[in-house]
Amino acid sequence: MKVYPQVLSIAGSDSGGGAGIQADLKAFQTFGVFGTSVITCITAQNTQGVHGVYPLSVESVKAQILAIRDDFSIKAFKMGALCNAQIIECVANALETCDFGLCVLDPVMVAKNGALLLEEEAILSLKKRLLPKTNLLTPNLPEVYALTGVQARDDKSASKAMGVLRDLGVKNAVIKGGHTEHFQGEFSNDWVFLEDAEFILSAKRFNTKNTHGTGCTLSSLIVGLLAQGLDLKNAITKAKELLTIIIQNPLNIGHGHGPLNLWSIKKHV
């Protein structure tokens, strides 16, 4: 009988299916890894926007984590939207009793319109309780600014931001350069800072509005590859290659920013 690596996503639910838990489980399935989930909040959203965010109780979040702990052998996991300080503290405390393997944190903190999704208390909890325990952080540029106060716009400022993140206990990070008005050239750069290497992943930009869930999908692809035995550097590089293929092959669903086309990478995994 074939054994499938087991992974976990701790994140919010997207009723539109393009981001959050739904995007994570689709990415896991594409890789042939078995995805489990802990839902932190329910969102009412579609391709045109988020219409409501409803955090779950800390009791329900804790119960989900412990249920996964008691029955599954998790090889790697990711965290996405954690909603508020209470849920962040709950997750941090519960994880101290778990062995879920390597952790990828996609710090969902800033909305597309630039509004902060986490209050200051929650950001402080995230910095103190979760950043030092994370094996890989995958922030976009607005999230880098929220965490460090540094506007990362080029190699020098990205390196400066990483210095601040390292002071906060971050070991490895992918600073994603595609989520900003400042980069509208032919290529988009992601800055990768690992404990033993630093490099840039550059990919051609594509003219598409169907990019909802790119951050969730990238972190989930990395988790799936880690669970299959790749090291961090190769998992990040391969995930970026796959995400580029996905964006090249848009999925026209809904009337706004459509979801990603995970079917497009079936033959590449």
Curated annotation (Swiss-Prot):
Gene3D superfamilies: 3.40.1190.20. Its EC number is 2.7.1.49, 2.7.4.7. It comes from Helicobacter pylori (strain J99 / ATCC 700824) (Campylobacter pylori J99). It catalyses: 4-amino-5-hydroxymethyl-2-methylpyrimidine + ATP = 4-amino-2-methyl-5-(phosphooxymethyl)pyrimidine + ADP + H(+); 4-amino-2-methyl-5-(phosphooxymethyl)pyrimidine + ATP = 4-amino-2-methyl-5-(diphosphooxymethyl)pyrimidine + ADP. This is Hydroxymethylpyrimidine/phosphomethylpyrimidine kinase. Catalyzes the phosphorylation of hydroxymethylpyrimidine phosphate (HMP-P) to HMP-PP, and of HMP to HMP-P. Belongs to the ThiD family. 4-amino-5-hydroxymethyl-2-methylpyrimidine binds at residue 45. GO terms for biological process: thiamine biosynthetic process; thiamine diphosphate biosynthetic process. Keywords: ATP-binding, Kinase, Nucleotide-binding, Thiamine biosynthesis, Transferase. GO terms for molecular function: ATP binding; hydroxymethylpyrimidine kinase activity; phosphomethylpyrimidine kinase activity. InterPro entries: HMP/HMP-P_kinase_dom (IPR004399), PM/HMP-P_kinase-1 (IPR013749), Ribokinase-like (IPR029056). GO terms for cellular component: cytosol. Signal peptide: none annotated.
